[in-house]
């Protein structure tokens, strides 16, 4: 980009104190390059607020007690977007680390590119299951139609986000966002040379729940059955197919 942009970082938080400290510490490294920080405290009952105020005392903080949307994460991002002023919107999960060179991806945000996501890697040191998941993630490259942008940490041009009307109250809000961008003539991409780490510990129960939710999301956006089947087989995610075929999509109230 030709000039230094104003960047607004939006981070929704729902009882994330187990991972939040590492996330905030890494984000602090690029504080002088960020225009504003917006933290959405979504029904937090832990020590998350104190951590945010300690590390970012001048940040904008919203304490949300009631959810009006079915997907509270999507609602949190929309709240942050509406109160932000930056030219670039950075969507940042609370359990993800910020690389020092994150802003190098700004060069990709030009012409018809609306959104750039960083490559997300699982922190394999967190647990044995995390280590297995770390290596399983490499199957994403063999998924039908190739690797697609994912959430966790991405930067978006404000003008593009405004054009598509912001976030929608759907199960997979960022997948829907990419669909909206394509319909508006924009592209979303992921860079492989800048990575961030997912700190959360995995469990079998969480993995199954995540796959079922992903299947419901694919059904909601009317993804073709053949593609869901290929995804489930090639990436070893059988419960995605179960969620797509047998679960209703109407009740998708989610928190971070």
Model segments located where?
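Non-catalytic, C-terminal membrane-associated alpha-helical segments of glycosyltransferases
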Residues: 204-256
């Amino acid at each position: 980009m030709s000039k230094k942009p104003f960047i607004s970082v939006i981070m929704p938080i729902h009882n994330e104190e187990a991972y939040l400290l590492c996330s905030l510490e890494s984000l602090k490294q690029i504080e002088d390059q960020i225009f504003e920080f917006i933290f959405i405290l979504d029904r937090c009952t832990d020590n998350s607020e104190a951590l945010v105020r300690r590390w970012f005392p001048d940040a904008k903080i919203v304490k949300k007690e009631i959810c009006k949307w079915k997907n509270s994460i999507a609602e949190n991002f929309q709240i942050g977007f509406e109160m932000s002023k930056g030219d670039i919107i950075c969507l940042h999960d609370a359990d993800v680390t910020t690389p020092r060179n994150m802003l190098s991806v700004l060069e990709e945000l030009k012409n018809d590119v609306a959104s750039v996501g960083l490559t997300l890697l699982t922190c394999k040191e967190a647990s044995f299951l995390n280590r297995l998941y770390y290596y399983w993630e490499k199957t994403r490259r063999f998924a039908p139609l190739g690797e697609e942008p994912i959430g966790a940490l991405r930067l978006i041009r404000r003008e593009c986000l405004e054009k598509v009307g912001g976030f929608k109250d759907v199960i997979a809000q960022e997948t829907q966002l990419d669909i909206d961008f394509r319909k508006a003539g924009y592209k979303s991409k992921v860079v492989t040379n800048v990575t961030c780490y997912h700190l959360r510990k995995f469990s079998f129960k969480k993995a199954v729940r995540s796959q079922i939710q992903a299947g419901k999301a694919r059904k909601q956006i009317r993804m073709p059955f053949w593609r869901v089947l290929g995804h489930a087989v090639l990436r070893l995610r059988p419960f995605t197919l179960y969620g797509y075929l047998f679960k209703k999509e109407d009740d998708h109230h989610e928190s971070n």
